[in-house]
């Protein structure tokens, strides 16, 4: 995950792997390189410009939130998709922004001058915060653009990004969930993968081609920098690059911090969510109504659950702890002898002492969050605080009733997708887990209630859900209808409120302050440890941990062999999609039109030897935030859009191993096929004037026995 300005130093390695263009074509500060075609999509995804008229390609799941604001019962874009027939039909997405990184510059000297390595963080942070504000203002004034400074290498370096954010972004194309979310949670974090995870937007600008608020008078943003599209394909071993905005990685932490992940937080989260998902799955199987209520929530909970399992698997299989300990042994030997970093000698011992003291708190807090606060009724107990606030105000009875009703109406989103009987069974399962593991540290209220209910969690659960007004919207509305000034006691006596208040009091007064002090201490130690590692290995070119800033990763198209005997291909195809079709399943139901196109093998110019590629694997280092990232070939041409990782390699957030870690991308040819043949929006493809020419030139120059591909009687590409 290299900072773009670093890649000049990586050029030899990149070319040895197959790069065919100069690195200054990938990044430069003149505005003529590929970095000017990569955008931060919204607040946490990546997108790529694919036409001179501001057309943006990103993931289906990145556009999901914006499309949700546009869809309705009579315009269900999730079920049917959406394809604009022209620019007039492109739909404004309120609140969605697109940010370009115009250039990046190392400003460490401006931020850290006269700031010592061992200066305590409170004083250090005060100085740095003031300097960042001043330097950002300086760059913004000079460039007439926005400037954002972020820390790198745990605060040992600072870089400024000169950015330009556009506020008028419109939906252009969005495949239905039967394509864009195909496979759902079942295929999430998995390979083989069959999801057409893409969507299309367009950025608009004012008359001066600069950012502007939405206006019907705005024009498509004009740019000379956009990605050429290659439909020539790829083969295993081909060079690839991924450009984007990876969110968070922690590759340089100590073994003590890594142990917290794979031995404490991940296992607890996995165990708690396994229990919750088991209960939800049973109830969803028994009731269609509950299935619909819990589908989205289940996907959200299962997302982390599956990722963490892969993370633990990968860390153990790759002996991540062994590698950390071996490195730390050498580090300590160096620190004992070398005087260039005098602060380094005691770092590992201090880290061990700090983590040893914090581990019991981290253990307890993870159970608090995943087990206790994993129960929806207890979460909802927090919302009762808003009702209590109504009684603290000096309101008349009628005004109080009206205010309570409005507050309760705001909770409708929760009760629309809530089933008390299902949650009661979750309570029984998770509370048993909590008592089995946290009996000594749990709130006293929990112990007394357990004893009061004859130490029978089932009995306790039935009583809680029977008595709590938070278990249904009807109970809350009934309470609000006749609420008097003295009725605040009814809320304070509600079991959901008491369960939440008890755990919240323990967390806020005992656990969170102590953990905040620990994290503050570790931030200081991590910064010094990162500094010492860079001093120790002066010849090594380090890349900083991800922090949602522009990065480039490179690797190769490469299949994988996960645990077991199965050897998977590096590519999937449409035939596999159709083979998975299940009309009774919300996540494996293939749209009829797509099945018809497959049956007729009507792939247009996008198919390859009678097949339609769908997704492929490569060994690029990615993480959250790389969703929607352009995947490029050796010539910097777009061959796909990144959207996921197989769970066997999710440990790459802590240890990247190119032999095990993979990124999953949707093939650009599948994207073009869906746009053209399924969506009937071929006019969008015409905007990328280089698409056909690039494919033909590559095939002609690189294939020993190319054959001509015909489309509508015209030669449009060579295949091989």
Regions from the PLM with identified roles:
Residues 1-720:
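Terminal presequence/propeptide segments associated with secretion/organelle targeting
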């Amino acid at each position: 995950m290299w900072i773009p300005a670093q890649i000049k130093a990586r050029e030899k390695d990149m070319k040895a792997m197959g790069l065919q263009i100069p690195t200054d074509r990938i990044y430069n500060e003149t505005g003529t390189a590929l970095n000017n075609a990569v955008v931060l999509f919204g607040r946490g995804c990546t997108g790529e410009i694919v036409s001179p008229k501001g057309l943006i390609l990103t993931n289906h799941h990145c556009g999901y939130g914006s499309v949700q604001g546009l869809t309705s019962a009579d315009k269900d874009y999730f079920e049917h998709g959406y394809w604009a027939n022209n620019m007039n039909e492109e739909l404004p997405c309120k609140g969605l922004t697109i940010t370009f990184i115009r250039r990046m510059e190392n400003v460490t000297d401006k931020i850290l001058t006269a700031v010592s390595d061992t200066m305590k963080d409170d004083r250090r942070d005060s100085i740095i915060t003031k300097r960042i504000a001043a330097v950002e203002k300086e760059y913004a004034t000079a460039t007439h653009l926005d400037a954002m400074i972020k820390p790198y290498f745990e605060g040992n370096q600072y870089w400024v990004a000169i950015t330009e954010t556009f506020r008028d972004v419109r939906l252009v194309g969005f495949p239905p969930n039967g394509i864009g979310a195909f496979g759902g949670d079942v295929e999430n974090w998995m390979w083989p993968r069959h999801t057409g995870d893409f969507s299309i937007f367009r950025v608009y600008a004012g008359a001066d081609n600069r950012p502007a608020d939405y206006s019907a008078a705005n024009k498509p943003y004009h740019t000379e920098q956009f990605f050429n599209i290659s439909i020539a394909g790829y083969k295993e071993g081909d060079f690839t690059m991924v450009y984007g905005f990876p969110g968070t990685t922690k590759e340089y932490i100590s073994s003590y911090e890594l142990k917290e992940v794979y031995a404490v937080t991940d296992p607890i989260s996995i165990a708690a969510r396994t229990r919750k998902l088991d209960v939800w799955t049973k109830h969803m199987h028994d009731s269609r109504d509950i299935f619909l209520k819990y589908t989205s929530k289940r996907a959200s909970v299962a997302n982390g659950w599956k990722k963490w399992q892969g993370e633990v698997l990968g860390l153990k299989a790759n002996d991540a702890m062994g590698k950390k300990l071996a490195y730390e042994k050498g580090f300590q030997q160096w620190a004992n002898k070398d005087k260039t970093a005098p602060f380094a000698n005691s770092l590992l011992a201090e880290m061990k002492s700090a983590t040893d003291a914090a581990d019991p708190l981290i253990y307890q807090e993870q159970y608090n969050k995943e087990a206790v606060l994993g129960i929806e009724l207890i979460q909802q107990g927090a919302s009762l605080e808003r009702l209590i606030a109504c009684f603290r105000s000096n309101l008349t009875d009628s005004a109080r009733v009206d205010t309570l009703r409005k507050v309760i109406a705001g909770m409708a989103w929760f009760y629309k997708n809530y089933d008390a009987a299902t949650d009661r069974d979750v309570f029984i399962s998770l509370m048993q887990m909590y008592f089995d593991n946290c009996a000594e540290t749990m709130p006293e209220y929990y112990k007394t209630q357990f004893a009061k209910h004859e130490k029978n969690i089932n009995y306790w659960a039935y009583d809680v859900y029977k008595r709590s007004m938070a278990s249904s919207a009807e109970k809350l509305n009934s309470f609000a209808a006749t609420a008097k000034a003295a009725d605040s006691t009814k809320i304070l006596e509600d079991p959901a409120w008491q369960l939440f208040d008890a755990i919240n009091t323990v967390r806020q007064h005992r656990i969170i302050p102590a953990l905040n002090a620990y994290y503050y201490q570790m931030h200081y130690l991590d910064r010094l440890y990162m500094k010492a590692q860079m001093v120790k290995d002066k010849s090594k070119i380090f890349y900083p941990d991800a922090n949602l800033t522009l990065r480039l990763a490179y690797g190769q198209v490469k299949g994988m062999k996960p645990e077991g005997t199965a050897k998977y291909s590096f590519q999937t195809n449409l035939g596999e999609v159709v083979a998975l079709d299940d009309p009774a399943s919300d996540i494996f139901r293939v749209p009829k039109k797509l099945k018809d196109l497959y049956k007729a093998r009507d792939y247009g110019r996008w198919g390859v030897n009678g097949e339609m590629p769908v997704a492929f694997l490569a060994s690029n280092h990615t993480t959250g935030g790389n969703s929607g990232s352009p995947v490029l070939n050796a010539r910097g041409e777009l061959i796909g859009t990144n959207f996921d990782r197989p769970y066997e390699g999710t440990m790459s957030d802590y240890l990247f191993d190119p032999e095990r870690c993979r990124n999953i991308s949707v093939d650009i040819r599948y994207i073009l096929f869906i746009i053209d043949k399924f969506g009937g929006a071929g006019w969008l493809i015409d905007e990328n004037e280089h698409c056909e020419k690039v494919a033909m030139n590559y095939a002609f120059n690189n294939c020993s026995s190319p054959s001509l591909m015909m489309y509508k009687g015209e030669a449009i590409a060579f295949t091989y």
